[in-house]
Every structure is written in C-alpha cells, then in structure tokens.
Amino acid sequence: MNIKSLLLGSAAALVAASGAQAADAIVAPEPEAVEYVRVCDAYGAGYFYIPGTETCLRISGYVRYDVKGGDDVYTGSDRKGWDKGARFALMFNTNSETELGTLGTYTQLRFNYTSNNSRHDGQYGDFSDDRDVADGGVSTGTDLQFAYITLGGFKVGIDESEFHTFTGYLGDVINDDVVADGSYRTGKIAYTFTGGNGFPAVIALEQGGEDVDNDYTIDGYMPHVVGGLKYAGGWGSIAGVVAYDSVIEEWATKVRGDVNITDRFSVWLQGAYSSAATPNQNYGQWGGDWAVWGGAKFIATEKATFNLQAAHDDWGKTAVTANVAYELVPGFTVTPEVSYTKFGGEWKDTVAEDNAWGGIVRFQRSF
C-alpha cells in the first residue's frame, strides 16, 4: 500500500463518519412566537385579552381609609374619640361575545379593618373574628361582596337588590342611608329588558339580605320579588320599583326622578311608601309608612365636586349630609363630609340624643 492510497482511504473514512454524525444530529425546533397580552377596548378602558382566549379581563380596585369623629349620626351616641376603618377592594370583570349576547362576570373581594373607639361600624361589613367592637376594639374580616354572571339582560349571583340599583343610590355621600331604604346585598336572578324606546324594565327574584342586627332572607321557597320601569333621556331619568317581601307578605315602592340642570349641576328626588309601617323588613326600612330623599351634585372644578343629600321619614327622623370630593391627583380622592340627624317623633325614644353631628374624612386610591 502506497502513501497515496492510504491518504485517499483516510479521507473517505473521515467523510463517511462526518455524514453519519450529521444524520444523527438533533435539530432544535424553531421557537414559537411569543403571544403578548393584547389590549381589549370593546368594553372600556383597562381590559385585556386572557392569552389563548377571546375573553376580556379587567382587574381594578381601591384602597380606602376613613377617620370619623363626633356623634354617630345613625344612633345618636357620642363616639368619644376617633373611629377608623380601612378597606382593600379587588374587582374582576370578564366579558366575551356569544350568540346570545355578551357573557360577563363580576366579583369583588373586600378586606376590612376596623378600629373603633366606641361602636361597631357596619359599613365595613362582615368580620372574621367573634369580638364585638360595639364598645371599642379592633376587628378584621374578608367579604365576598359581589359574585355574579350576566348573559345579555340575564343576571344571576350575589349582587345588590334591584330595589336600589334600578332606581339609583341615595347620592354621592358616605352617610347616605341614615334614613334607610332597604337591605342591599342579596342572591338574585334578574332579567333587564332594554328596548330601543328608552324604557328599560326589570324583574328580579331575590333571596333577601341581612345587616348587623337582622336577617331578611327568605324562610322557604317563595322568593322576594322586585319589578321596575324606567325612562331615561338627555334631560335625566324617572324610575319606579315595586318590591314584595315574601317573609312578612307586605310590599314597598319607590319613585325617583333625576334632572340634569346643566352638564355640571344635577338634582334628584325620591319618594317611597311601604304597606308595613316598620323598619324591620327587607325593603321598606324607613320609619313609618313613607319617606322622602333628595339631593344635588355640582361639579365645581375639574378636581372638586360638591354633594348634598337630605332625607325625612314618617316617624320623624331628618338627616342632612354634605361633602366635597377633591381629587388631589388622578386616582386619589380626599372627601371630607359633615352629617346631621334630628331624631324626632317616634325615633326620639330609641336613641341616646335627639340631635347628632358627625364628621368623616375619607382617603381613597382607586386603580
């Protein structure tokens, strides 16, 4: 064997080995394209598509801190010091389109803290411990305030009663229900019809709610029933609701009108009547047969809004509240509020003092 043959044989072997190794090599697949979060603007600001779906999600919430002093305008008692409360609320909205309309959900979790010098503040909801803070103390709790599903005009889950939501709330004040107009949170099945003529209507079957002292939930299979009709236009709106309390077998009704005087100034007035002249019921919780509420809202500047509410019921309770909501920077609002309650008539013997003056300052960061 000569040198030339040896070199040619070695080269051929080397080429064959290289080809075999190339045939056995693992080829890495091409990387998949990264699917970044997409903005969903079909349902308003803050929504984005859940990756891999056509469902839009929005996460929002607020952090709030309240400081209260003076009298308790709900009971007439002297606080004898500062009452404080904090809340972190976290909200989730989802929406997607189906052949039956928009399919949506809404949930709200509340994490509450209350440190009272003198009394329990029911405004901060359910507490996880058993300590009674009526005479002072600290309490904390977590509350699932809302959890419902919507499909078109259909709604089912935990929400606030249509007795409130359909007509509207009692003004943009903190102490809005000193003259109460019914319990709020309830399990319900509701349907709202919205025609093209500006006349939405609602029908709801409700479980009933509860507060610190009373339980208004149904005691059998028969639900509470709420029905309502509304007309809305550029000038404002007028709405009415009728509710049947299946526990006490009585009914209550409210009629409300809102008028936009200008694009910065609006007023509203609401009257109510109950066939059962007692606050111990699910809907007509004012004193006596009737009650009336009224209020105004004035947008003074881009940062400051003035709110006023006044109310009176058949038993002689009169309540007035005013505040200024001032937005220091976008998303952060400070609201000082002053309230007065006169306990007259049949209310006089149920409270510590006939006249109560109270104040509150709320700090809230919304996101």
UniProtKB/Swiss-Prot annotation:
Annotated InterPro entries: Porin_alphabac (IPR003684)
Subcellular location per the Swiss-Prot or TrEMBL entry: Cell outer membrane
Cellular component, GO annotation: cell outer membrane; pore complex
Disulfide bonds: none
One GO molecular-function entry: porin activity
The keyword Protease is assigned to this record: no
UniProt KW keywords: Cell outer membrane, Ion transport, Membrane, Porin, Signal, Transmembrane, Transmembrane beta strand, Transport
Signal sequence interval, chain numbering: 1-22
SUPFAM superfamilies recorded: Porins (SSF56935)
GO terms (BP aspect): monoatomic ion transport
Primary location recorded for the protein, binned into one broad class: membrane
Membrane topology, record value: Multi-pass membrane protein
A Pfam family of this chain: Porin_2
Protein family membership: Belongs to the alphaproteobacteria porin family.
UniProt free text on domains: Consists of 16-stranded beta-barrel sheets, with large surface-exposed loops, that form a transmembrane pore at the center of each barrel. The pore is partially ocluded by a peptide loop that folds into the pore lumen.
Primary role: Forms passive diffusion pores that allow small molecular weight hydrophilic materials across the outer membrane.
Subunit structure, interactors included: Monomer.
Other noteworthy facts: The pore formed by Omp2a is larger than the one formed by Omp2b. Omp2b pores have optimal permeability to allow growth and protection against harmful compounds. The larger pore formed by Omp2a may be advantageous for intracellular growth, when the bacterium is competing with the host cell for nutrients whose concentration is particularly low within the phagosome.
Protein name: Porin Omp2a
Organism: Brucella neotomae
Lineage, highest ranks first: Bacteria, Pseudomonadati, Pseudomonadota, Alphaproteobacteria, Hyphomicrobiales
Gene: omp2a
